[in-house]
Amino acid sequence: MVREIVHDPMFLQRKSEDATQADLQTAQDLLDTLRANFDRCVGMAANMIGVAKRIIAINDNGKYLVMFNPEIISKFGEFETEEGCLSLDGERKTVRYKTIKVKYFNENFKQIKRSFSDFTAQIIQHEIDHCNGNCPRSEERRVGKECRSR
């Protein structure tokens, strides 16, 4: 089911709880919502649809991938970039890594460790930030600021 996008920074700044197999429907709703917004969005976290669970979905060059409880276990190749977000207006500067290794569970709750690079790595980092409650303020453009201070 396609869900409405959450824009409330107070909700988005809350750290999400670990997902369980009971959250499979939320993952499907997240995927449906991502697909419905394919023209303006390449990734989403569950809190963007109002569910504070550690679930992300990404569009990796036309192939959709859902991750439960994703965690970056290694990273290298730091760079600065600007990113937009479906939940927030405008673009913000941020620091990302060119290559990351992520530990996550798939839809069968089998643990996976996989490396990602370039734009796909950037998408995953952005969505994991959502899971961690890292939400840049729309009016703040400096690197490292979050909406926690609101």
Please give the residue ranges for each predicted region.
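Positively charged, low-complexity/disordered segments
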Residues: 140, 144-150
